[in-house]
Amino acid sequence: MSQLKITQVRSTIGARWKQRESLRTLGLRRIRHSVIREDNPQTRGLIAVVSHLVEVAPADASSAGTGGSKK
């Protein structure tokens, strides 16, 4: 199965409880935090709930081991 890189780009301030819980379920805790998840219907459903708070891109082999970006 393919994988997705999901990055939180907006804050949860003002977000509904279901949206906050969806971010936690995906493993996202802060802005610019990225996670790699399998591309399956369950993950796509969680992404649909918080699509305005995250960016989604296909995960390539070079980003598979990173938990986030460091500057």
UniProtKB/Swiss-Prot annotation:
One of its GO terms (biological process) is translation. GO terms for molecular function: structural constituent of ribosome. It comes from the Bacteria. The keyword Membrane does not apply. The keyword Ribonucleoprotein applies. InterPro entries: Ribo_uL30_ferredoxin-like_sf (IPR036919), Ribosomal_uL30_bac-type (IPR005996), Ribosomal_uL30_CS (IPR018038), Ribosomal_uL30_ferredoxin-like (IPR016082). Keywords: Ribonucleoprotein, Ribosomal protein. SUPFAM superfamilies: Ribosomal protein L30p/L7e. GO terms for cellular component: cytosolic large ribosomal subunit. Belongs to the universal ribosomal protein uL30 family. NCBIfam families: rpmD_bact. Part of the 50S ribosomal subunit. This is Large ribosomal subunit protein uL30. It comes from Mycolicibacterium paratuberculosis (strain ATCC BAA-968 / K-10) (Mycobacterium paratuberculosis). The gene is rpmD.
